Curated annotation (Swiss-Prot):
GO terms for cellular component: cytoplasm; early endosome; fungal-type vacuole membrane; Golgi apparatus; Golgi membrane; late endosome. This is Uncharacterized Na(+)/H(+) antiporter C15A10.06. Residues 1-31, 86-87, 150-159, 210-227, 299-315, 367-392, 446-567 are lumenal. It comes from Schizosaccharomyces pombe (strain 972 / ATCC 24843) (Fission yeast). The lineage of its organism: Eukaryota, Fungi, Dikarya, Ascomycota, Taphrinomycotina. Belongs to the monovalent cation:proton antiporter 1 (CPA1) transporter (TC 2.A.36) family.
């Protein structure tokens, strides 16, 4: 029935495609139908997710189903008369980068299990930086060799080939990680794949944007060093922007009484995070890097200055927005295979690129894993940080490509642009279906341990703070709820609420905080001497102590400090 409705709607004024944008009423009609189609598909994807999870079906993930459903609907739209709705539901990189990607990146940083992440930080950074570079160069060289042979009349420059390599080096293992969650796979493997993926996207984006600056220019030996310099500067300035805005948010929550107004507090936290993304993009830096580290900083510091309601709201709002975006993206990708009519498909090039993507992932994972294992054996002689072969194989299998690559491909220009975009889209969908659809089976084949309990359940990390467990806190919450429901202020006659929220005490309290903060800064100034005189094995422990004893006292409320140093 839906098919009949769609065909009838598309047939209406099907000959008026050239008038697209000239009739506002007709444009609004088609926009409504396009959004309706996408929302129905999104609801269907979420209901599928509910069914799969409730029935504990692990053989296939709902994201793969979402891609197939998107492909079917995209095919229906393609064969129907008219192009207006077809153009509206096609993949647009602007929508992706400005609307769909930020919630996913923010939630990734905010939900990051920091103790596991930093415990495996060396391995994660190795795969994210060196691994992405190896993948991009390997893929770029293989693609360039193919174009040099001039099959299918495809001729590419070396910069175009490397840009293609950077585009298809962005991994997106959402499907794999979701299956890992359902199987409760070992946290070490989960953390390495998760950490690599979130940093890998940022590295791939910065690498692609760096290469685009050399498009059409003559390459020299020093171009390599120039490109590396631009990459490093862009990455670390973006990181600094994200961390700075996260720290500013933590201080804002500490020195204000926003916790009295949880709805305003939650809105400000969300907007501050998005500010880091768009400010960084506006400065020609990487918004993905900024937003990722802003989310990590918010969770590490600002989280403990939030009210209990703000903790709940930010956690689940970020998670809901990310899940909606992820499902929407998979549907979007499936539809785009048929709705983007200007793409140029070259079957042999697509096949060669798919093989090259697999080869580049192999050249990334296995040599680096062996190098890391050798380093860990020589350094400490134990097997705690050892990456077994089964984990290496799973890392290789988890390297499926995602929507970031498709969005980056929109930046291609020149006569090969449509071919490169089409190839990227097909390779992404193929890897999602092949690797994502067989992940559960690979876990069984590799005999990877499952049913492992997580160190910390993410839903239990929002614990009541000591002062929130008191009867006064319940009275305060009741007072605020009554205040929200009526215009009359409600005053609670309790010493706790008077000390914390009496406006007459704000100035003295702030002066005490500022004085205490100045003393903490003085302590921090001399603490770095210990770091540079400590051994390499003690530096990680020193950084942890420095964070808990110096940085957190500056950024966290004294009442929240004990809770904030538990992680």
């Amino acid at each position: 029935m839906l098919d009949t409705i769609l065909i009838n709607v598309f047939r209406r004024d099907g000959d008026d495609d050239d008038d697209d944008g000239q009739d506002p009423a007709l444009q609004e009609l088609y926009s409504s139908w396009a959004l309706f189609i996408l929302l129905v598909l999104l609801i269907g994807a979420l209901l599928t997710s509910y069914y799969v999870q409730s029935k504990k079906i692990r053989a296939i993930h709902e994201t793969v189903i979402s891609v197939f459903v998107g492909m079917v609907v995209g095919l229906i739209i393609r064969v129907s008369p008219g192009l207006i709705i077809q153009n509206m539901v096609s993949f647009h990189s602007t929508y992706f980068f400005n609307v769909l990607l930020p919630p996913i990146i923010l939630n990734s940083g905010y939900e990051l299990h920091q103790s596991n992440f930093f415990r495996n930080i060396g391995t994660i950074l190795t795969f994210a930086f060196a691994g992405t570079f190896i993948s991009a160069v390997t893929l770029g060289v293989l693609v360039y060799i193919f174009s040099f042979l001039n099959f299918e009349n495809l001729s590419m420059t070396f910069v175009e080939a490397l840009s293609m390599g950077a585009t298809l080096s962005a991994t997106d293992p959402v499907t794999v990680l979701a299956i890992f969650n359902s199987y409760k796979v070992d946290q070490k493997l989960y953390t390495i794949i998760f950490g690599e993926s979130i940093l890998n996207d940022a590295v791939a984006i910065v690498m692609f944007e760096t290469l685009q600056q050399f498009q059409g220019k003559t390459l020299h030996f020093f171009t390599l060093f120039s490109g590396i310099g631009i990459f490093i500067i862009t990455f670390f300035i973006s990181l600094l922007i994200g961390v700075s805005i996260g720290l500013i948010t933590a201080l804002l929550l500490k020195y204000s009484y926003l916790r009295r107004y949880p709805s305003i507090e939650s809105c400000i936290i969300l907007l501050m995070a998005y500010t880091s993304y768009f400010f960084s993009n506006g400065c020609h830096m990487s918004g993905v890097v900024s937003l990722l580290f802003c989310g990590i900083t918010l969770k590490h510091y600002a989280f403990f200055n939030m009210s209990y309601k703000a903790k709940l709201s930010t956690k689940y709002v970020f998670r809901v927005l990310a899940q909606l975006s992820e499902n929407f993206i998979f549907i979007y990708l499936g539809m785009s295979l048929f709705t983007q009519v200007d793409l140029v498909y070259k079957p042999i090039f697509i096949l060669i690129t798919t093989v090259a993507v697999t080869a580049s992932r192999y050249m990334n994972v296995f040599p680096l894993s062996n190098l890391l294992n050798k380093f860990h054996r020589q350094r400490n002689g134990n097997l705690i940080d050892h990456i077994p072969y089964s984990y290496q194989m799973m890392l290789f299998w988890a390297g499926l490509r995602g929507a970031v690559g498709v969005a980056l491909a929109a930046g291609f220009e020149g006569e090969n642009a449509q071919t490169l975009r089409a190839t990227t889209l097909v390779v992404v969908v193929l890897t999602l279906i092949i690797f994502g659809g067989t992940t559960a089976r690979m876990l069984e084949i590799l005999h990877i341990e499952t049913g492992v309990a997580a160190d910390v359940d993410s839903d239990t990390e929002i614990g009541m703070l000591p002062w929130q467990q008191s009867p006064e806190f319940d009275l305060e919450n009741s007072a605020m709820e009554l205040s929200d429901a009526s215009a009359e202020p409600v005053v609670v006659d309790q010493q706790f609420t008077t000390e914390h929220f009496d406006e007459g005490n704000i100035a003295p309290t702030l002066s005490k905080k500022v004085s205490s903060t100045f003393e903490q800064y003085q302590r921090a100034a001399g603490a770095f001497n210990q770091f540079f005189h400590s051994s390499r094995d003690d530096q990680a422990q020193w950084l942890t102590r420095f964070d808990e004893e110096v940085i957190k006292p500056v950024l966290l409320e004294r009442d929240n400090l004990k809770n904030g140093t538990k992680k």
